Amino acid sequence: MAGTARGVALAASLVAVAGGRTGMAAPPEAVPPALAGHPVVLDGEGRLLSWVEPQEKAYGEVARLAWDRLLTGFPVEENGLPTWLAYCCFDPETLHGGAWPHNPACVYAGLVEGASAYYPFSGDRRVLDLVRRVLDHHLANGTTPPDPSWAWPSVPYASADHGAVRSRGAHDFRYAEKDDPRPRLGRGDGYGVLEPDKVGELGLGYLTAWKLTGDLRYRDAALACARALARHVRPGDAERSPWPFRVVAETGVVREEYGANLGPTLLLLDEMERLGIGEASEWRRARRRAWDWLVAFPLADDVWANYFEDLFWLPRPTNLNQYTAGEAARYLLLHPDRDPAWREHVARILGWIERTFGADTEKEKGVQWGAVAISEQVEYMFKMGSHTARFASVQALWHERTDDPLAREKALRSFNWATYMCDRRGVVRVGPTESSLWFSDGYGDYLRHFAAGMGAVPEWAPPGEDHLLRSTSVVTEVAYAPGSVRYRAFDDEGEEVLRLSFRPASVTAGGVALRPTATGAGYSFDPTRGVLRVRRFGAREVEVRP
């Protein structure tokens, strides 16, 4: 999910294009016949449908196309690595990498989250192999030394030079714009510089990978991330967040003070405490300081600033973005017990995102055939598929929690808009106007949102098929056979949502039959939608049969 200078000649130097600010009137224009290369499909009321037919299978098909492309469809570069291990972006025809700073921590964290949802959905174990490949590479080539004299030991770098085998932050002077009156540094963070919020994001990815695979190296990597974050948490204010946005890994010298992306870090600390890993008192202390700041500042003043690694350095937190706000809203919707005011906070975030990033810009309309299309950040206001899909997924979760029908409609139309960014090859572009291709925007931070949407609104999953859509745990094994679904979860207590092609007559957990019930251990089945909900206690293995 990079920001500036995406769309021009990926194989050559990329030139930044300043996006318009929200609130500017879009020029009148005729309805175009196509969106991102696909003919526009509308319903009888002129509202946007997906380009995929049949419509009811659109989101599952987009996921299949894009995952298949990622798993099988990219070349090996001159450095011996597949494109997605060394480049942020790629050419639309050759699929070879482009000359812009790589953002591995963001990409790999998103891929782990997406794979942990797509594996139970599909049963395709290749995505687990991909998780191992990207994480093993970054552990070996993108991690600070385990040297206690370093301020940030044993944690991931967020960025790298394009084509580099080793990630150490990018040499930012290589990516300064040649036509700037003075060089604007900071793109790719700078050599030796890391981003603490990505320590939290990829730390959470490592923890999820441990749950998926049982590999203790990933648990230990997550522990190192949590310890570094707890050690460096600080009081925040309107100009300084609990962790800086950019910091020199060896010395701890701060390069940029403010970053509001706390959702993944809060969840990492929550999970470390829940699982009894490491120092619970330290996790609680760090979490409390971060949470208090989040409530006092971004949740109150809407300064959701800084996330993207390829933006130049700014002296103050003026580059607002929807990513940090949207992921904070997701955290609250998935864990409402953490915040008594979750309804007010999430409603505020969703309204702010729609007003600030769903409005018209100089180049693009904010509402297209009834779909709210979301821009990325103040410094780059192009409408993008991944960010529109994030908005859709959070709206779907809000609908699930509140039964708000307008949120469901917004989610549906925005998801439909986002499908247009994926072509029949499974190549996903950033957006219809900003048409470059990124592994973050097209895969890591795109696919996971469709999975979240189908989990929140199960009737959006393909009918007449069998799919495990969501679990409160991590699903470590799944097996589909005609008239049967079997799965195993990491936690011995949890809830799952499935869409089935058959009416279940037998649901067992740990070999013990569950009873149909709306509350407590058991299951409920909606025959009109084919939706099964399982609630289990003291059991990891579930089998469903007709």
Residue ranges of each PLM-predicted region?
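Carbohydrate-binding/catalytic loop surfaces
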Residues: 79-102, 149-193, 239-264, 302-329, ...
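C-terminal beta-strand-rich structural cap/linker in extracellular carbohydrate-active enzymes
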Residues: 496, 521-546
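Low-complexity, Ser/Thr/Pro/Gly-enriched N-terminal "stalk/linker" regions
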Residues: 27-106, 125-185, 223, 228, ...
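Surface-exposed beta-strand/loop patches in extracellular or lumenal glycoproteins
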Residues: 488-505
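Solenoidal tandem-repeat scaffolds enriched in leucines and small polar residues
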Residues: 189, 193-196, 200, 205-210, ...
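Non-membrane alpha-helical segments in proteins
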Residues: 100, 106-121, 133, 203-208
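Bacterial N-terminal signal peptides
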Residues: 8-19
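Terminal, non-catalytic domain-edge segments
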Residues: 27-80, 133, 178-183, 187, ...
